[in-house]
Amino acid sequence: MPVVTMRQLLDSGVHFGHQTRRWNPKMKRFIFTERNGIYIIDLQQSLSYIDRAYEFVKETVAHGGTILFVGTKKQAQEAIAEQAGRVGMPYVNHRWLGGMLTNFSTVSKRVQRMKELEEIDFEDVAGSQFTKKELLLLNRELEKLQANLGGIRNMAKTPSAVWVVDTKKEHLAVDEAQKLGIPVVAILDTNCDPDEVAYPIPGNDDAIRSVNLLTRVVADAVAEGLIARQGGKSGQAAAEPMAEWERELLEQHNAQQAEQAEAPAAEAPAEPAEAPAAEAAPQGE
């Protein structure tokens, strides 16, 4: 079964690039044609690049890696949080703070500060050691930290790879990943630079449906990698207990496997025994 179909790509508008006056000549090889002043992306290439990126993400996660999901533009914020959350991966969907990767130790301290503030009961003024004004200021600090760092609260170290929606907007994230040698997997619209991305997916990085589809595909690859990782652990007596979301993924996978196994058995009796003879008849004419 393919990771994604041509019909899904078309329905989601993955093939629509930018206006012809807004393009990067390095993207020429990914462009199929031009229509009404808009570049049309070659979806046959997109399909093969999706397969390549999917395999990389799956294998990276299967071997214990982490994928950081990054997309701070409005069209990407919801999909990034939802899909990363679905598979228990870290994400940044509000604002990229300089040094999130290259100065990770300092960022980790800010995450720790956020966790400390979360321990405060802001409703209990009398029981706290702070004044009303101090609590108000601390609450504002917490809200800001949660918006910027909430998605990476459980990221203990720099990620193994980064999934990026819109490499031009997220150029800081891409630059930091490149400095550290962290592979970037990203949607490449017709105005992007393919040299910045190790695993490109030529496609529309502006349409919500396109961003949703491709981010879900990457999350599916993560899910498959987690299942493979857990399968490898199952033979170890000292394996760590699964997180709730990991257990849900494994249960979904097992249910799908069971359905697929039942389907052929249910269909088998419906096949007519005379089918080969019926097929042979036209050849005798």
UniProtKB/Swiss-Prot annotation:
Segments of skewed composition (Low complexity): 255-285
GO BP: translation
Keywords carried by this UniProt record: Ribonucleoprotein, Ribosomal protein
GO molecular function: structural constituent of ribosome
Annotated stretches, region: Disordered: 231-285
SUPFAM superfamilies: Ribosomal protein S2
Record-linked InterPro entries: Ribosomal_uS2, Ribosomal_uS2_bac/mit/plastid, Ribosomal_uS2_CS, Ribosomal_uS2_flav_dom_sf
Gene Ontology CC annotations of this record: cytosolic small ribosomal subunit
PROSITE patterns named among the record's database cross-references: RIBOSOMAL_S2_1
Family note: Belongs to the universal ribosomal protein uS2 family.
Protein name per its UniProtKB record: Small ribosomal subunit protein uS2
